Amino acid sequence: MIQSHVSVMLNEMLEALSPKAGESYLDCTFGAGGYSKAILESCNCYVTALDRDPNVIKRAEEIQQHYGERFDFVETNFADSFAKLKEKKFDGIVLDLGVSSMQLDIADRGFSFLHDGPLDMRMSGQGLSAEEFVNAAEEKELADVIYKYGDESFSRRIAKRIVEYRKTARIDSTSKLAEIVRSSIGFRKGKIDPATKTFQAIRIYVNDELGELEQFLVNVKNILKKDGRLVVVSFHSLEDRIVKNFFKENSEKPVVRSKYAKDDMTIDPNKWLKIITNKALAPSDKEVGLNIRARSAKLRAAKAIYE
């Protein structure tokens, strides 16, 4: 039995993607499999799912056992997926950016300040860990990362406190880092935890999340069929800005023309997208009430008008 999972903006994603029987879809961020399962359930279509986190393989195997040849899983990050997909093209592509509930809820992964665990935060388990970064980075670099990726106005104060603390002891757990941040800027009851932005910033940095997103978008045209849809759910203003600008730069502005004008407009192959969502969609108040992690989500979608 496949375990249930609360996926953010699931209905909005399905409406924007508009799956059809016999078509193939790419879920670039498999996570707990919520999007993949919903797409497979919507019609008799096919889904290829990607994820760099080896801990999701068991969940992928469960879905594969249930849906058979209609589902395929590839262990890779989406930015490096193009070579592994072997020039395959899809009728729709969906990205659910950020960290999954499954990663947040496992203390040993080190993503969350709500659970004490080793300060890791690596999605793939490889590369620079959060612990290594926090204990080795210069104060200015710490402040820059926390400000840039967390939009944290107290970034300099937090960075200074981190450097002071590590002179006496290594920062090797999520609880230690969270307390350092809280002691730097104070904790107000009922407000968002002061550690939220710092944890987000460090996670984005060590996993190069924005770099991967940009690299993927540059190449996505090569794997999206004509009339195929690209749906992106983001959770951070920087992610959303990247997606918004990409859609804008690669789409034609609507032109109101006279019915008497000759149809001699030159087609610009670089303007290969048509934006479906004029403004980013946000989750309903009801969804946010049921799943607080949805509060910052934004969904944008576009359709390929040329290959």
UniProtKB/Swiss-Prot annotation:
Record-listed E.C. numbers: 2.1.1.199
An annotated Gene Ontology molecular function: rRNA (cytosine-N4-)-methyltransferase activity
Binding site for S-adenosyl-L-methionine: G33, G34, Y35, D51, F78, D96, Q103
Record localization: Cytoplasm
Disulphide bridges: none
Stored InterPro entries: RsmH, SAM-dep_MeTrfase_MraW_recog, SAM-dependent_MTases_sf
Catalyzed reactions per annotation: cytidine(1402) in 16S rRNA + S-adenosyl-L-methionine = N(4)-methylcytidine(1402) in 16S rRNA + S-adenosyl-L-homocysteine + H(+)
Protein name: Ribosomal RNA small subunit methyltransferase H
